[in-house]
């Protein structure tokens, strides 16, 4: 069985939130591993918006599948392989029914979007 999640985010919204709440926003939404990448590479709002959209899309796919009743954004890590391709890691949560979890992220200076496929 396959489930999908999709999300679109206005980059300006994430930029405003990041400027207002900086560390509080990062700590509420992103895992320690993701925050370290943000700080190391000094990533901007476009990057954060893509990661945020991917988390939201992942959450939608997981919730629609019924294998979880709730999941926090911090539990959904959006990381990158060495070649830059994004992937989803559930930050230590083991869901035995998950066969595959794919994510695609795209963005412009105005919008970021993500599409997730969850296979059970």
What are these regions (language model features)?
Residues 1-120:
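Core catalytic alpha/beta fold that binds nucleotide/phospho-ligands
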């Amino acid at each position: 069985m396959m489930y999908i999640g999709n999300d679109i985010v206005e980059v300006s919204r994430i930029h405003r939130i990041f400027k207002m709440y900086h560390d509080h926003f990062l700590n509420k939404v992103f895992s320690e591993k993701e925050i370290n990448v943000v700080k190391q590479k000094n990533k901007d709002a476009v990057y954060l918006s893509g990661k945020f959209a991917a988390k939201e899309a992942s959450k939608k796919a997981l919730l629609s599948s019924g294998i979880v009743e709730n999941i926090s954004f911090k539990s959904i890590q959006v990381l990158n392989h060495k070649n830059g391709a994004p992937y989803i890691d559930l930050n230590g949560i083991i869901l035995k029914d998950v066969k595959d979890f794919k994510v695609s992220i795209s963005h412009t200076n105005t919008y970021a979007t993500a599409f997730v496929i969850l296979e059970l």
